[in-house]
Amino acid sequence: MAPVKKLVVKGGKKKKQVLKFTLDCTHPVEDGIMDAANFEQFLQERIKVNGKAGNLGGGVVTIERSKSKITVTSEVPFSKRYLKYLTKKYLKKNNLRDWLRVVANSKESYELRYFQINQDEEEEEDED
């Protein structure tokens, strides 16, 4: 058998990639139908790092709340889609899924918006 060569990467250490995602809950929090602190607690309990929920990888993932915006910062690969999944799960648990939806308003942020119900269509049906 031929000896196995080890690949040596020149250039030293890899640059740490810090991922930062924000969840804007301004509208539902102002209207009083949702509690941002409760949502932050839900994320801390549910986010999985290395297959384990609740510990946030010993500081690898951090969750910060400022008024009605929640910021999730991660030093390990973390999916924005996973954050959307957890947000939808929270909305379903609190029976808010029928009124709120999760919309991406930029590359690294989500916003909770109300469903737009067309008032014109309802008025036309009432007239008939």
Swiss-Prot record:
Indicate whether Oxidoreductase appears among the record's keywords: no
GO cellular-component term (any): presynapse
Q: What does the record give under GO molecular function?
A: heparin binding; identical protein binding; RNA binding; structural constituent of ribosome
Q: Which Pfam families does this one have?
A: Ribosomal_L22e
Q: Where in the cell is it found?
A: Cytoplasm
Asked whether the keyword Ribonucleoprotein is assigned, the reply is: yes
Write down which residues bear the modification named N6-succinyllysine: 69
- The chain residues annotated with the modification Phosphoserine are 66
| Any one biological process term the GO annotation gives | alpha-beta T cell differentiation
Keyword list (alphabetical) reads: Cytoplasm, Heparin-binding, Phosphoprotein, Ribonucleoprotein, Ribosomal protein, RNA-binding
| Cysteine pairings via disulfide bonds | none
**Primary location recorded for the protein, binned into one broad class:** cytoplasm
> For the modification Phosphothreonine, which residues carry it?
62
- Misc. comment: Binds to Epstein-Barr virus small RNAs and to heparin.
Q: What does this protein do?
A: Component of the large ribosomal subunit. The ribosome is a large ribonucleoprotein complex responsible for the synthesis of proteins in the cell.
Which family, according to UniProt? Belongs to the eukaryotic ribosomal protein eL22 family.
Tell me the subunit arrangement: Component of the large ribosomal subunit.
Q: What is this protein called?
A: Large ribosomal subunit protein eL22
Organism of this sequence: Homo sapiens
Q: What is the lineage of its organism?
A: Eukaryota, Metazoa, Chordata, Craniata, Vertebrata
